Amino acid sequence: MLTNQELTAKVKEISLTYFKQSFDHEAKWNQRLRTTGGRFFPKDLHLDFNPKMAELKDFEGVILHELTHYHLYRSKRGYKHRDADFKRLLSQVGGLRYAPSVIDKKIKYYYSCQNCGQLYPRQRKIDTKKYRCGKCRGKLILKTSGN
């Protein structure tokens, strides 16, 4: 994994390549990030990144996403996810709109519908008397348990 200095250098390089503007602040790893790819801090303009994202091939897209926040904020334009400026610039540079999932879900139970055969992978057990198939309203049965 890259050090914080190497990460900052990579972010600066990507900023010049895609935005033709310099990144003049710090980029660092944040171990506490679980589901997000990164965070932009308007208060001091630094970027935090999830270290689990570093191994993904889409990591450059996560960096582009955070740099989009950074450059729009510095140019006093809409830098939030809902703003048209953000959506437009993000699509122009090819950044990711959403962070890829790094959480590996442990599927323990597989339910299937008796009527249509629709399969429902689940992490937790469900009450088959209470829940039905969302497709045809058929009865659900437990196929296999991963225990």
Curated annotation (Swiss-Prot):
GO molecular function: zinc ion binding
Location, primary (coarse class): cytoplasm
Binding site for Zn(2+): H65, H69
Protein localization: Cytoplasm
Active site per UniProt: E66
Domain of life: Bacteria
One Gene Ontology biological process: response to stress
InterPro entries the record matches: SprT-like_domain, SprT_Zn_ribbon, Uncharacterised_SprT-like
Domain SprT-like span(s) in chain numbering: 9-142
Note on cofactor: Binds 1 zinc ion.
Cofactor: Zn(2+)
GO cellular component: cytoplasm
Keyword list, A-Z: Cytoplasm, Metal-binding, Zinc
Family matches, as Pfam families: SprT-like (PF10263), Zn_ribbon_SprT (PF17283)
Family: Belongs to the SprT family.
Protein name: Protein SprT-like
Upper classification of the organism: Bacteria, Bacillati, Bacillota, Bacilli, Lactobacillales
Gene name per UniProt: yciD
